[in-house]
């Protein structure tokens, strides 16, 4: 009798602890959702996150607040999310750096892209274009390569930071073309782009999410684009392959992660609202305006896409010898 009473009490206690958690999942979301962006405000990642967050507010029924936490090749923001409570109220933008590059760039990470995050879904991918200041003497990519070879070490390029897609795109370009161009890292795409426009640094790889308006306005000049086909918004700009640099497709991609252990109903809710946002007219127009390609789908599809990019970039990063620690 005593044993039966003890078991009954334990079962009741377990049920009382599980019930509030189950109700919290059923009521999700019932408070503000914090969206970590591991880059400064004003860059392509930030613009995209704010656009999608605005669309998601309508279906989630809660505010989605952007919290910019730049630094350490996205590792600062990633650490915040990896250690957050897995309740769906802390999510983040995740891109090539976190999901494809950092495991190859750092000897040791405080978290694993595979084990310490819940994959929620993809947002978009967008190609990078090699751009120069309008006053730079090279008019074509062929001219640019010839200038770089004739002036080894005298040409600088900007990037949003060490280990960014823009940084590694140029390093791959250098390896493919046999050129020596010095890296000048910035804290975000916006300040890097400003200095290329101002002529302080002559060139950079620039993602279309941030760069399309300044390319179209003539504030920078695009020599080539790192996509498989030409961008419809820039029909006069050749791809890198068309301009003679083969096997050099370079693009940035974005998706959403949460901490590991997010309950399946929460992941499903966030993924569904994300896909609704990507299908909305406002988000589709904004993406088209910035040369983006939407990446709707399931959490597993996004995870597989990210892992395929990690496998693609691993040998490239190893060949360049770049390390960030």
Feature-to-residue mapping (PLM):
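N-terminal twin-arginine translocation
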Residues: 1-27
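Hinge/capping helix and adjacent helix->loop/strand transition within the periplasmic-binding protein
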Residues: 83-88, 104-191, 240, 253-286
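A ligand-binding cleft/hinge motif common to bilobed small-molecule-binding domains
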Residues: 97-108, 167, 174-176, 203-237
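N-terminal (or domain-start) structured segment
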Residues: 24-115, 154, 179-202, 296, ...
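Conserved functional loop/turn residues at catalytic and ligand-binding sites
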Residues: 5, 10, 32, 68, ...
